[in-house]
């Protein structure tokens, strides 16, 4: 029997298991269901027994997302598995057709291949033994609204668990930051090329405010929404930028121009994010 040792704490109570885990639940120890707390992500083998039930929870301010670990068609599990939107077995079943379909990103109509709960709890009932072996991935995710008001668009543009909302109402950098906070999000802090490309491929040819600023100390750039210094992290300044002109203390981004230091009071679109 193979044991997976990464960051999992396993306790057995009667015939059920209670597991806090970030990766793989070992097949031989799972008994037939139990309680599972998802700290980040977990992959479980579908049991070979019938009527096994996992009660799954995560942090109260997050939700859960279920997908197949191999990326296969999620609908193939329905013959063997029912995922309930809550711990009660009478809670509604989660189906692809009753999910929010965003206008952009991985959860837009036609490509959605995972299901999301509406709270931090779910019950997974393996009602029949599967005819083939497959693994179910369960991740902790943030809630992602359809939009954050008029002239806005939201979606899971980077991965299954985070959320980005573009607002096309022009505001100052400080006002865009306040708008994001009012919607339980933060103004964009770009941590990688992958993240920046996702933003620009989703909303091209648009200038966006970020939370980057050197307003506290000239030349010391900080992602205000996270408190993390820009350097030595990822940066993508445009030609001759930052040019350190007086009053240009906030980072404005564009898909073809790169990053610019710009006057924080200028009215620009913005991107909010939640992770």
Q: Model-predicted segments: where are they?
A:
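Conserved hydrophobic ligand-interaction patch in extracellular adhesion modules
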Residues: 167-212
């Amino acid at each position: 029997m193979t044991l997976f040792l990464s960051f999992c704490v396993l306790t057995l109570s009667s015939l059920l298991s209670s597991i806090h885990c970030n990766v793989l639940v070992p097949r031989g120890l799972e008994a037939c269901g139990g309680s599972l707390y998802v700290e980040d992500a977990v992959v479980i083998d579908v049991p070979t027994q019938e009527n096994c039930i996992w009660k799954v929870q995560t942090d109260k301010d997050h939700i859960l997302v279920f997908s197949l670990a191999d990326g296969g068609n999620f609908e193939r599990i329905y013959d063997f598995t029912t995922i309930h939107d809550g711990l009660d077995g009478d809670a509604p079943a989660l189906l692809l057709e009753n999910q929010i379909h965003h206008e952009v990103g991985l959860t837009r109509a036609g490509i959605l291949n995972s299901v999301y709960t509406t709270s931090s709890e779910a019950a997974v009932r393996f009602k029949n033994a599967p005819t083939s072996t497959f693994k179910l991935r369960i991740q902790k995710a943030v809630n992602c609204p359809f939009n954050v008001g008029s002239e806005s668009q939201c979606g899971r543009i980077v991965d299954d668990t985070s959320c980005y909302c573009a607002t096309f109402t022009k505001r100052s950098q400080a006002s865009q930051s306040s708008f994001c906070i009012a919607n339980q999000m933060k103004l964009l802090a770009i941590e990688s090329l992958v993240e920046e490309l996702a933003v620009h491929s989703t909303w091209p040819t648009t200038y966006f405010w970020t939370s980057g600023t050197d307003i506290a100390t000239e030349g010391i750039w900080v992602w205000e929404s996270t408190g993390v210094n820009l350097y030595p992290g990822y940066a993508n300044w445009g030609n001759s930028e930052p040019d350190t002109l007086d009053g240009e203390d906030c980072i404005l981004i564009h898909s073809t121009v790169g990053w610019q230091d710009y006057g924080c009071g200028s009215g620009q679109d913005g991107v909010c994010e939640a992770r």
